[in-house]
């Protein structure tokens, strides 16, 4: 990762948003590992490594991409399209429910951090009014952009949580 100057506030927002203790539910979400174990797909270190590689690939092109695209969103219309796109890529009902719940919680935190950013406020309000489905990567991307964090750092930090 490149060394880039950043404000102390931006660094604090990164640390806060990506803290595993942040009460969004991400810490307790197994990302499908429990199901893979129960189905006999993960039984040893080798099969776990295979599962983990698949998870990281999905996270890179799913959640990290959601962070970057949310970081770039400039309008409510594009935000709505991104939310719908992210929801449509989640095929398992458990994943949709988990993402919706975590997205709602992350958006609430984002609004506390950046109460004057129009897209942060819009996403939180839209989730409460059920106009959006919810995705924590979108909420994180919006708040990290608003805090002045570049998109590369935002995506990398999000994957570290």
Which residues fall in each region the model found?
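Extended, highly charged
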Residues: 152
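C-terminal auxiliary extensions adjacent to catalytic cores
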Residues: 41, 45-46, 155-161
């Amino acid at each position: 990762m490149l060394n880039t100057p950043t404000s102390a506030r931006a660094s604090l927002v990164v640390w806060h948003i990506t803290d595993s203790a942040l009460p969004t539910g991400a810490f307790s979400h197994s990302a499908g590992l429990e199901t893979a174990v129960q189905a006999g797909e993960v039984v040893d270190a080798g099969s776990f490594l295979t599962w983990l590689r698949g998870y990281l690939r999905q996270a890179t092109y799913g959640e990290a991409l959601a962070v970057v695209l949310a970081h770039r969103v400039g309008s409510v219309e594009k935000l709505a399209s991104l939310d719908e796109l992210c929801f449509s890529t989640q095929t398992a009902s458990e994943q949709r429910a988990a993402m919706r719940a975590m997205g709602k919680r992350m958006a609430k935190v984002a609004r506390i951090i950046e109460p004057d950013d129009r897209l942060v406020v819009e996403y939180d309000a839209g989730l409460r009014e059920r106009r959006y489905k919810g995705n924590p990567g979108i909420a994180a991307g919006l708040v990290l952009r608003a805090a002045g964090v570049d998109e590369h750092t935002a995506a990398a930090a999000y994957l570290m949580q």
